[in-house]
Swiss-Prot record:
<dbReference type="InterPro" id="IPR006885">
    <property type="entry name" value="NADH_UbQ_FeS_4_mit-like"/>
</dbReference>
<dbReference type="GO" id="GO:0005743">
    <property type="term" value="C:mitochondrial inner membrane"/>
</dbReference>
<feature type="modified residue" description="Phosphoserine">
    <location>
        <position position="181"/>
    </location>
</feature>
<protein>
    <recommendedName>
        <fullName>NADH dehydrogenase [ubiquinone] iron-sulfur protein 4, mitochondrial</fullName>
    </recommendedName>
</protein>
<dbReference type="GO" id="GO:0045271">
    <property type="term" value="C:respiratory chain complex I"/>
</dbReference>
<keyword id="KW-0597">Phosphoprotein</keyword>
<keyword id="KW-0472">Membrane</keyword>
<comment type="similarity">
    <text>Belongs to the complex I NDUFS4 subunit family.</text>
</comment>
<comment type="function">
    <text>Accessory subunit of the mitochondrial membrane respiratory chain NADH dehydrogenase (Complex I), that is believed not to be involved in catalysis. Complex I functions in the transfer of electrons from NADH to the respiratory chain. The immediate electron acceptor for the enzyme is believed to be ubiquinone.</text>
</comment>
<keyword id="KW-0999">Mitochondrion inner membrane</keyword>
<dbReference type="GO" id="GO:0006120">
    <property type="term" value="P:mitochondrial electron transport, NADH to ubiquinone"/>
</dbReference>
<keyword id="KW-0830">Ubiquinone</keyword>
<keyword id="KW-0813">Transport</keyword>
<dbReference type="InterPro" id="IPR038532">
    <property type="entry name" value="NDUFS4-like_sf"/>
</dbReference>
<feature type="transit peptide" description="Mitochondrion">
    <location>
        <begin position="1"/>
        <end position="28"/>
    </location>
</feature>
<keyword id="KW-0496">Mitochondrion</keyword>
<keyword id="KW-0809">Transit peptide</keyword>
């Protein structure tokens, strides 16, 4: 037999096998109205279970205005009259380069402070005065403040870093005519 004939016989045999499998599957398939096989989880379930599954499979909608202040545990007098400053913290003066300059931070306004008579420490009755929370963007910080019921304001904006001109290094660039040849 030639190679072409062998390939034709194989493809014909595989086509016949495919058609036989398809016919057998059609015989064993469900006689449901959609024509497809039934899911065993739904076929054997009681109507109450199906109704409960349909309720649980739906989407849960949350109102857009979420107020976390009643469940945060912070006293009411610290929530009502607070004002939050959203800002970019200044760059560290140590040798950290530009590390931690791309974050936004919230900071609360100052409340009454007094000097502790025993130790001389600065004291405050405000639990939120020393809390600093960092965020990746001002929008995240604004959302956080609104959910907690605090008034806020954005102080300063993100300033893009200027590209510095490197004057001295340009003198030794390989593609400039300022280099003096030694020969």
């Amino acid at each position: 037999m030639s190679a072409l004939r062998q390939v034709m016989c194989r493809s014909t045999a595989s086509l016949q096998l495919y058609q036989a499998n398809r016919a057998a599957a059609a015989r064993w398939a469900s006689t449901a109205t959609d024509g497809g096989p039934l899911d065993p989880k739904t076929a054997l379930a009681r109507p109450e279970e199906l109704e409960q599954r349909n309720k649980l499979s739906g989407k849960i909608t949350v109102p857009t205005a979420v107020n976390l202040s009643p469940i945060s545990g912070v006293p009411e007098e610290h929530i009502r009259e607070r004002r939050v400053r959203i800002h970019i913290p200044p760059k560290n003066a140590m040798q950290s380069g530009t590390d931690n300059v791309n974050t936004w931070q919230i900071e609360f306004d100052n409340r009454e402070r007094w000097e502790n008579p025993l130790m001389g420490w600065a004291s405050s009755g405000d639990p939120l005065s020393n809390m600093n929370v960092q965020f990746g963007s001002p929008e995240e910080a604004i959302t956080f403040c609104e959910r907690n019921g605090w008034r806020w304001y954005v102080d300063g904006a993100a300033k893009p870093k200027k590209e510095r001109v490197k004057n001295y290094g340009i003198n030794f660039a390989w593609n400039k005519r300022t280099r003096v040849s030694t020969k």
